[in-house]
UniProtKB/Swiss-Prot annotation:
Keywords: ANK repeat, Repeat. It comes from the Viruses. Pfam families: Ank_2 (PF12796). ANK repeats lie at residues 62-91, 104-132, 133-162, 193-219, 220-249, 251-279, 281-309, 310-339, 341-368, 400-429, 431-457. This is Putative ankyrin repeat protein L112. Signal peptide: none annotated. The lineage of its organism: Viruses, Varidnaviria, Bamfordvirae, Nucleocytoviricota, Megaviricetes. SUPFAM superfamilies: Ankyrin repeat. The keyword Nucleus does not apply.
Length: 457
């Protein structure tokens, strides 16, 4: 039995909408009769958006307006229906504008091109959306690989300007060979754009596109090799070497790029071409370490590459990145006291607790420059765990006339404020000063906590 809007009392419809949660928007869009259910929505609809983090899928509840939703989905009949109601000043639209929302024609065109909704693309262009005020609709269609949409935009008389040429570069970044072929046949693309497109194709590993562009007589630069090396595209690397690209340029920067990307197979391949370890750029070791590639750092040492010249930098940036295994390895190789101290600053700045503890155990001076790390870094960032570690190690928590507690009040670091008081900082003589510092920096949580301290006692 079919159910219409008038078959059920309002209270039941409200319960149904609540029960359907993220699917409620689809109920409203079943037909024009059910569309009246938006009267019962107090807040915007929402849908669950899927986001992938590595191998794990996550869903985030995201508020949506009805018009954005139907445009994104390409529901042309509903779009036309809503626009007709709007043109007639229908109360259903006027009274529910918060739920319905609004969208410009140009934005709607962009959504349509992004999702390859050709029918809505045609509709919004006919309604006056501009295909020439921005290259975004065309560029988006190129990135997504929607050839039919790209063809239609050109059929509408799109202006050929520099931003249009850039679309072939964007298509190369996403491996859209069909788009690259169409654009190169449709318009005359300047050589600079073809050259950049070739570099992007190599960088992102699209060998088929690289080969196609090479046949268009593009210029081959070493930048294409660097991009392929850093991203681990061994087939592209082999292809470029076959074309005559010299891997020895800039002190074998191709190997340095592979070190940064963590691609041992590419390093070994390049060395097999006759490159000597001593020819490798001194930055190779540093780049391997700063990106946490311990295996490559060890490999460079084993083959006799320079691991000394940039060792201090390597330690500092591996500490900054929190790569404890790399930090341990570099310290085993031998570093100066100055290097240990600078690495501790970086690790503290980026709250790498395990690295900080290891560096301190290895001899880094955690009290350097009158407890600078504690008073000027930790106390400005509310690193509570690290603050307690430093306090337990013996930093002066009232250094420079109570600078730490003043700093946390200035920066709103309430966790460390509580910690300092717990470990015995006498706040009473300077309580008014601390409150004034917090007030001048709009730190309401600090103000409330300080004012409530006597009550808590």
């Amino acid at each position: 039995m079919d159910i219409t809007y008038d078959d059920l009392p309002v209270e039941i419809w409200i319960r149904i909408l609540k029960f359907m949660k993220d699917s409620a928007v689809n109920l409203v869009l079943v037909n024009t009769d059910f569309f009246k259910l938006i009267y019962f929505k107090k807040n915007k609809f929402y849908e669950l958006k899927e986001f992938n983090f590595g191998m794990q899928k996550n869903y985030v509840k995201q508020r949506i307006t009805l018009i954005n939703y139907v445009v994104e989905k390409g529901y042309l009949d509903i779009i036309v229906y809503i626009n007709n109601l709007k043109s007639n000043h229908n109360p259903l639209i006027i009274d529910n504008i918060k739920i319905l929302g609004s969208i410009s024609k140009d934005t709607a065109l962009w959504y349509s091109c992004k999702n390859n909704n050709l029918a809505t693309t045609k509709y919004f262009i006919n309604k006056g959306a501009s295909i020439n005020s921005s290259s975004l609709p065309l560029k988006t269609a190129c990135i997504e690989g929607h050839l039919d949409t790209v063809k239609y935009l050109f059929s509408c008389g799109i202006e050929i300007i520099n931003s249009i040429y850039d679309c072939i570069v964007s298509a190369c970044c996403y491996g859209r060979l069909n788009i690259v072929i169409y654009l190169s046949n449709k318009i005359s693309i300047p050589g600079d754009y073809i050259n950049e497109a070739f570099v992007m194709a190599c960088k992102y590993g699209y060998l088929d596109i690289a080969k196609y562009l090479f046949n268009l007589d593009c210029s081959i630069t070493v930048d294409a090799l660097y991009g392929a090396c850093i991203n681990g595209h061994i087939e592209v690397v082999e292809y470029l070497i076959g074309l005559g690209v010299d891997p020895r340029k800039e002190k074998c920067w191709a190997i340095t790029s592979a070190c940064q990307g963590g691609h041992l197979n590419i390093i070994e391949f390049l060395l097999s071409l006759g490159i000597k370890p001593k020819e490798i750029n001194v930055d190779a070791f540093y780049h391997a370490c700063k990106t946490g590639n311990l295996e490559i750092a060890k490999y460079l040492k084993e083959i006799g590459a320079d691991t000394i010249t940039r060792r201090d930098w390597a330690l500092e940036l591996s500490a900054r990145g929190g790569y404890l295994d790399v930090v341990k390895y570099i310290i085993e190789l031998g570093v100066s006291q100055k290097s240990l101290n600078k690495a501790l600053i970086d690790a503290t700045l980026f709250c790498r607790v395990e690295v900080v503890e290891y560096l301190v155990d290895s001899g880094s001076d955690f009290r350097q420059n009158d407890d600078y790390l504690f008073r000027s870094i930790i106390c400005t960032r509310d690193y509570v765990e690290m603050a307690e570690y430093f306090i337990m190690k013996g930093v002066n928590i009232i250094v420079n006339n109570n600078e730490p507690i003043k700093t946390v009040c200035h920066n709103g670091c309430i966790g460390i404020l509580k910690l300092l008081i717990m470990y015995g900082v006498d706040y009473n003589p300077i309580k008014d000063q601390l409150i004034n510092i917090a007030k001048s920096n709009n730190q309401s949580a600090i103000i409330k906590y300080l004012e409530d301290l006597d009550t808590l006692k």
